[in-house]
Amino acid sequence: MADLSLDELIRKRGTAAKGRLSVRPGIGGVRSRVGIQHSLVNQPARTATFQQRFDARQKIGLSDARLKLGVKDAREKLLQKDARFRIKGKVQDAREMLNSRKQQGTVPQKPRQVADAREKISLKRRSPAAFTSPPIGTVTPALKLTKTIQVPQQKAMVPLHAHPAGMRINVVNNHQAKQNLYDLDEDDDIVVPVPPKQMKFAATGSLVHHMTGLSSSKLSMSKALPLTKVVQNDAYTAPVLPSSVRTKALTSMSRTLVNKEEPPKELPPAEPVLSPLEGTKMTVNNLHPRVTEEDIVELFCVCGALKRARLVHPGVAEVVFVKKDDAITAYKKYNNRCLDGQPMKCNLHMNGNVITSDQPILLRLSDSPSVKKESELPRRGNPASSNPPAEVDPDTVLRALFKSSGASVTTQPTEFKIKL
């Protein structure tokens, strides 16, 4: 193609456009028909160049609307929303759930740095606001005991150290959110001879009153601080207060029911009365031999806090939940659910009853309050005692059944008339 000026190119394209507008014969004059013939003669070369430059297929291929919008095939959507996959996902084997949870839990977590309380106290002492003379007895933070039932006094763990002249006692204010340590002055130190070996020290008697007086006068507090019993770390034992309260309640209950005073020796054993500290136990049977204790812990810790979980022997596991509701949810979730291809048979031990895997309806019956069962326990234990059972009066039975007394029955005989 020879070099053409811009004017000639515009002129040629204009004549080609005029020829396209007047395609129909018989319309227009001689010029239009001559223009058509002239354009038809020169048409093949132009159409070739037009197809090379402006091919409609190339434009459609480059700017396809489906490619821009990212439209997916309908079959892929159907596969994603298929109900069969949803059903399979809900009833999947528990082993698949464990494996997926392990893959998610492989992200490394930064270990928490647990600082010792003694280091914190030493940092406080080094600050300029602290006292110049370091105190001899140090106080650790008050422990949060989760396994006690409303103990009136809270235990504080204080290690005691020997001192030739005396010892310094720190008072812990448990009523404030942040524990403040108050040191008494050296003039008011209580001199107690302490041997070089550590010993148990209990603040009782006049020492308690003296300590409350010192705390109210020196620390100028509106209310006397509760003094706690100071024991050694290794010698700490849980209080036995709740069991005694429970036995007292049972004795009073049995006396009101029987109207007879019974010695506490004849009470039924306290084993069926389950305290909330014991937790709710659930046994899992029909397990695959390759199921380990870690699998049991990982499987049931999702439902709630576990008190303990162990594998009794291959095929049988025992799980104890802290809360009763968590045990019920775990029973509903995992009962008759497959683990490694075998359905788990869960037995729930609640309030002395055992709900097996074939009796899920007993969950509703066992949700009744346990106070009724506690009141029924002495009633069951009374016939087993040495007292003979009370004699039943037949008149009372007749009154209850027929709403009439025995005397009326004897005085008024029944007449029968028989017709033959």
Swiss-Prot record:
Q: Which residues carry this modification: Omega-N-methylarginine?
A: 33
**What biological processes does GO assign it?**
poly(A)+ mRNA export from nucleus; positive regulation of translation
Q: Which SUPFAM superfamilies match?
A: RNA-binding domain, RBD
Which residues are reported to carry the modification N-acetylalanine? 2
Q: What GO CC annotations are associated with the protein?
A: cytoplasmic ribonucleoprotein granule; nuclear speck
Cysteine-cysteine disulfides: none
Q: State the protein's purpose.
A: Is involved in regulation of translation. Is preferentially associated with CBC-bound spliced mRNA-protein complexes during the pioneer round of mRNA translation. Contributes to enhanced translational efficiency of spliced over nonspliced mRNAs. Recruits activated ribosomal protein S6 kinase beta-1 I/RPS6KB1 to newly synthesized mRNA. Involved in nuclear mRNA export; probably mediated by association with the TREX complex.
CDD domains named among the record's database cross-references: RRM_SKAR
User: A Gene Ontology MF term for this entry?
Assistant: protein-containing complex binding
- What's the protein name? Polymerase delta-interacting protein 3
* Modified-residue entries (Phosphoserine), positions: 5, 127, 215, 217, 244, 275, 385
Keyword terms: Acetylation, Cytoplasm, Isopeptide bond, Methylation, mRNA transport, Nucleus, Phosphoprotein, RNA-binding, Translation regulation, Transport, Ubl conjugation
Where is the Glycyl lysine isopeptide (Lys-Gly) (interchain with G-Cter in SUMO2) crosslink found in the sequence? 200, 223, 248, 372, 417
Disordered, as annotated region? 256-277, 369-394
Q: Which segments constitute the RRM domain?
A: 280-351
Q: Gene name on record?
A: Poldip3
Q: Tell whether Nucleus is among the UniProt keywords.
A: yes
Annotated positions of the Phosphothreonine modification: 140
The entry describes its oligomerization and partners as: Interacts with POLD2. Interacts with NCBP1 and EIF4A3. Associates with the multiprotein exon junction complex (EJC). Interacts with RPS6KB1 (activated). Interacts with ERH. Interacts with THOC2, DDX39B and ZC3H11A; the interactions are ATP-dependent and indicative for an association with the TREX complex.
* One Pfam family this sequence matches: RRM_1
Q: Where in the cell is it found?
A: Nucleus; Nucleus speckle; Cytoplasm
Which PANTHER family does the UniProt record give? Answer: POLYMERASE DELTA-INTERACTING PROTEIN 3, RNA AND EXPORT FACTOR BINDING PROTEIN
Residue ranges with Basic and acidic residues bias = 370-379
